[in-house]
């Protein structure tokens, strides 16, 4: 405990004006209702007097508050009050859902006008991520009509270039082959076919590319359109995803 500074005297004055000198390092004023004020004379530092309010008892909700109000240029009035701290409700907040992780590679096997018409990687990522419901590693390959036709013939037996092809590796029904591992697959977009379709259907080119990426990503995750019920469910999913991306219903 610091010693009282040299030359400092503590004098108590009673109601009759009688003074008594007190030898002390700290004064405690007890108000009798649990409030207590402690005055300490520091032996160093900036302050001439340290004042601390306290509340007796075990109620952690009681908070002592000191209010000071100037009463003159050389005087202040001090008040000690006890306020009840607000109780913090114990609420179980919902945990934010973890977004699926998309590992994306974009390959461009294009030249000339096809290359200029191809979407950018950041666009493809945005469209693919919107349709993603599980972690996935996806390669999107943008090709010309010759490669698109060869792939469609080799894998589907159809001798023409189609707008989008989906290839899933080692998975069945849109689920990873090994639990905990990401879904893996390729999307192949034939750029000149997509450009031609957009013009014929009166659609913005980016809207048509977005639709086909979403369509391919849903195929990758197990959705199909082999019958009317499947087709309706897939079209509804595509429409909702595209609406979230700011695009109109592609089937309207």
Curated annotation (Swiss-Prot):
Keywords assigned by UniProt, alphabetized: Cytoplasm, Endonuclease, Hydrolase, Metal-binding, Nuclease, Ribosome biogenesis, rRNA processing, Zinc
GO cellular component terms given for this protein: cytoplasm
Required cofactor names: Zn(2+)
UniProt-listed Enzyme Commission number(s): 3.1.-.-
GO biological process: rRNA processing
Residues that coordinate or bind Zn(2+): 215, 219, 225
Annotated cofactor note: Binds 1 zinc ion.
Region of interest (Endoribonuclease YbeY), ranges: 91-252
Predominant location: cytoplasm
Xref: Gene3D superfamilies: Metalloproteases ('zincins'), catalytic domain (3.40.390.30)
One Pfam family from the record: YbeY
Family: Belongs to the endoribonuclease YbeY family.
Entries under PANTHER family matching the protein: ENDORIBONUCLEASE YBEY, CHLOROPLASTIC
Function of the protein: Single strand-specific metallo-endoribonuclease involved in late-stage 70S ribosome quality control and in maturation of the 3' terminus of the 16S rRNA.
Name of protein: Endoribonuclease YbeY
Organism: Azoarcus sp. (strain BH72)
Gene: ybeY
């Amino acid at each position: 405990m610091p010693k009282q500074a040299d030359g400092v005297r503590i004098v108590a004055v009673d109601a009759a004006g009688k003074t008594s000198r007190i030898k002390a390092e700290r004064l405690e004023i007890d108000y009798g209702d649990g409030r207590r004020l402690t005055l300490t004379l520091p032996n160093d530092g900036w302050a001439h007097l340290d004042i601390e309010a306290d509340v007796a008892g075990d109620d952690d909700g009681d908070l002592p508050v000191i209010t000071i109000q100037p009463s003159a240029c050389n005087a202040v009035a001090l008040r000690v009050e006890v306020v009840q701290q607000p109780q913090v409700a114990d609420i179980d907040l919902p945990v934010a859902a973890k977004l699926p992780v998309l590992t994306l590679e974009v390959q461009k096997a294009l030249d000339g006008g096809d290359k200029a018409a191809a979407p950018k990687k950041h666009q493809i990522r945005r469209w693919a991520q919107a349709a993603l419901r599980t972690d996935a590693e996806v390669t999107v390959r943008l090709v010309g009509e010759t490669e698109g036709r060869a792939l469609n013939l080799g894998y589907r037996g159809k001798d023409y270039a189609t707008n989008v092809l989906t290839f899933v590796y080692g998975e069945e029904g849109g689920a990873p082959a090994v639990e905990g591992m990401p879904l893996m697959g390729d999307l192949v977009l034939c750029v000149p076919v997509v450009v031609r379709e957009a013009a014929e259907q009166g659609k913005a080119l980016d809207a048509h590319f977005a639709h086909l990426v979403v369509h391919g990503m849903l195929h990758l995750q197990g959705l199909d359109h082999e019958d009317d019920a499947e087709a309706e469910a897939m079209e509804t999913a595509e429409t909702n995803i595209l609406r979230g991306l700011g695009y109109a219903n592609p089937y309207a």
